Amino acid sequence: MNKFSRTLLAVSLGVSCSCIVAAQEKAMGSSPIPRVLQITREFTKPGKAGMVHDKAESAFVQAMSRAKSPTHYIGMTSLSGKPRALFLTQFESFEAWEKDNQAVEKNAALSAALDRASMADGELLDSIDQGVFVFNEELSLRPRPDLSQMRYLDISVYHVRPGHNKDWTDIVKMVKDTYEKAVPEAHWGVFAQFYGGEGGTYLVLTARKSLTEVDRSFLDTKQFRAAMGEDGMKKLDELVAVSIESSMHNLFAFNPRMSYVADEWIKNDDFWKPKAAAMPAVAAKPATEDKKAKP
């Protein structure tokens, strides 16, 4: 599959949209799409992923729950690329983000609990970084904010060459217009990087109920190409070649043990109900004790 076809497949996005909702005083899944998206990436050390990391992250969830924080987030773990966990939180505005930070600072008990959790979690991590992105409604297609029934997230990262932002906009609009007509089920969200990374960085996100939707996206691509026609595909291919410097596509699985979601989600779907991390097996005691036995 050539570069353009791979890019096109990623932009096709299948069915459900990429709108991770965690807003001030609004339950995830019921609010409109917030504008500001904060993403924290945690790269785990070898052998420190899985339930070991889940247990450490559950301390953050418990701290937020005890404090009854109105700001929710979704945690997810990678199924491709370098082992890592992502934590996505959204706010209505940068002012709302500021108020959330101030509220945490003023809550001594919550701040202390988060500090303790961070120290324990840090022992498992190779590195950590954060990025802030802004939702672009114009380039998004039929985005849906409700992720309560979703289980996976596709994340495609595009780096646009300097001076080619208009070309990028033309590409996405061309793709959007055609998918809107040819593939009625298609949905996606586009976010532009605002802080924490290189300029010209865009995220195209899609949430999925199951991976069968990835299989269906191949058919969607065929329908798209047919609707574009030979001349349209040639023009699109040329724009992609001159404007997109690089792209990366990865898949993540939602992790309920790492997520702090609204009570509504937990009540309506067992997937989001907290589950205790597995405890190590305890060796059985001998029938009789030999006090002289050596350790």
Features from the language model and the residues they span:
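Bacterial N-terminal signal peptides that target proteins for export
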Residues: 1-11
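Short, intrinsically disordered, low-complexity terminal segments
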Residues: 7, 19-20, 24
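Bacterial N-terminal signal peptides
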Residues: 10-18
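Short S/T/G/P-rich N-terminal loop/turn motif that feeds into the first structured element of a domain
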Residues: 22-295
